[in-house]
Amino acid sequence: MKIVVGSRGSKLALTQTNWVIDKIKQKYPQIQFEVKIISTKGDRIQHIALDKIGDKGLFVKEIEEQLISGDIDMAVHSMKDMSTEMPEELKFSYVPKREDYRDVLILNKKYNSIDELPMNAKIGTGSKRRKYQLLQYRDDLNIVPIRGNVETRINKIEMENLHGVVLASAGIKRLNIQEKLDYNIFYLNEDIMLPSPAQGILALEIRKDREDLEEILKSIEDKNSSIQAVAERAFLKGVNGGCHVPIGAICNINKDNVELTGLLGKEDGSKIIRKSLGGKIEDAEKIGYELAEIVLKEIN
């Protein structure tokens, strides 16, 4: 059997795709794989802020078209890039183990933490979620909009004379560059910054009629990561969230219970609501929708 896997062409996307392939090969060594690189709109338009060129799905549409047409068998995405609406023919398969969900500050060597940064320090990020949470913690910071892949954004510290940039920890860890960086890494825990819903989780997308693939992908499922994905994406869907407003969520699991913390902000950051809701693990999705209702009431 041969499986053709669609992926974006960035170093991180290919690293993630190959990680999934390696996991499957451990269980099914006889399967052959081919990786097909597909360029997306989000990859091609690098000079405009993400919230200006459209919504979630910017890094996905062209890949989904090839899934539907049968040119590829499955696709590996960062789940946080995925819209909550999916083409009728497609579905997410089983969820593999989540990487670190936190955001990180990559800092100029002079500084070890966000608290050590000087007044009005320049921090690069293109995300409203990151921007407004940073400003909630330290309103003197000067947030500079940046875009690009992981390496490009790290290079902007030198090129644009920044004190630091914010990235997803998952990307740094998957690329395995934490040791090689000539910068300090400061992890932003969830009391400073809630991650994007499903940050650090990979989405394995297939056509609904591919039961043969479902069976194979079940072998790399991680139950807890799956529950987190369901709860956090229910919250995202409930607040009807795209790139235009700050949205964060994290689901913590303790034995048979979950606690979901969600954040929603106005587009200009003038108001940010953060709330938590707990319950039984089997109600994870319901809790996501209920928490969305609570924050929507408050923000309006």
Curated annotation (Swiss-Prot):
Keywords: Porphyrin biosynthesis, Transferase. The keyword Transferase applies. Disulfide bonds: none annotated. Pathway: Porphyrin-containing compound metabolism; protoporphyrin-IX biosynthesis; coproporphyrinogen-III from 5-aminolevulinate: step 2/4. Monomer. Pfam families: Porphobil_deam, Porphobil_deamC. It comes from the Bacteria. One of its GO terms (biological process) is protoporphyrinogen IX biosynthetic process. SUPFAM superfamilies: Periplasmic binding protein-like II (SSF53850), Porphobilinogen deaminase (hydroxymethylbilane synthase), C-terminal domain (SSF54782). It comes from Clostridium novyi (strain NT). Signal peptide: none annotated. InterPro entries: HemC, Porphobilin_deaminase_cofac_BS, Porphobilin_deaminase_N, Porphobilinogen_deaminase_C, Porphobilinogen_deaminase_C_sf. Tetrapolymerization of the monopyrrole PBG into the hydroxymethylbilane pre-uroporphyrinogen in several discrete steps. It is an enzyme of class 2 (transferase). The porphobilinogen subunits are added to the dipyrromethane group. This is Porphobilinogen deaminase.
